[in-house]
Structures are given as C-alpha cells and as structure tokens.
C-alpha cells in the first residue's frame, strides 16, 4: 500500500472536557464527507448515460457498441467494489475515497477528448474500476464513527447520496449544454461534470 494512502496518526490530544463535543462534531463532519463524496462519484458515473445520443450521432457508434460500453463500466464497477473495499481496509478512508474521485474525474476528462471506440471502452473500464473506490471508505467511515445501534439510520441518510448525485447530473449537464452549445457536447457531458465532482 502506498504511504500516501495509509492512515495518519492523530496530530494532537483533545482535552478530556472537550472530548464529547469534539467527537460529536467530527463524526458529523465524517458523515457529511462521505455523503458529499459519494454524491460526487455519481456525477462522474451517470453522466455517461446522458452522452449516449451524441455517441451515436457524432461518433457513429451503434446501439450495440454503446450498450457494450455501458456494460463494460458496470461490470468493472461491480468487480472493483469488492477489490477496492478490501484495499480500503488498509488505507485512510478519506484519502482513498478522494483519490478514487480524482481518478474518475481524470478519466472523464479523457473521455472529453476521445473519439475512437476502443479508447472509449478502455476509459469507461477504468472509470468503473475507480468508481469502486467510493463505497468501501464510506462504509468504513460510518462503522468507525457510529455505534451499531445508529448505523441503520446513518446508513439510510448516506444512501440518499446515491439519489441526489444521480439526480443532479442532468441539470449539471443540461446547464453545460446551454452555455457551451451542442457542438461542445464532450466538454458538457464529461469535462464539466468532472470539474463539478472534484469541487464537491
């Protein structure tokens, strides 16, 4: 495991009288971090679906090729969730999750400059693999900060990030198309969502 991904040591000791308040504040911060982080993962995953009409019109890809691209990403993502979650156990969840999101954004920028089918296929596979770096750290963070009796409620709240992230992709891409125009469909579909996801 790379040193940068390892969990760091605590930088300072908290005075006993402030432990309870500090703990409460930190665990809310931890929950919001994984909520917003996983929300951002969806921005650079579901944006691909919105680009499919342009893949057909502008790059002359067939429905079969587009379906294959979607399948490649989802299969890679499914495999990656198991592998990456195991690796996340040995890493700092915060750093691991952030690295995965940045890598997904980089792949999306690559999609914004690609036109060949096999390059697209390779990039969507990489996107699927890096997408798997989001779920493990989220579960680990929730388990580390919340007792078993609270995890159902906390997990339900975190799960909303899937819907919020998936729901805001269309407005983001739509606004990008309105500003940039359909001639810049790759930037609107891939590069703008990548930038928004990293800002999150």
What are these regions (language model features)?
Residues 116-124:
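Short hydrophobic/alpha-helical segments at membrane-entry points of transmembrane helices
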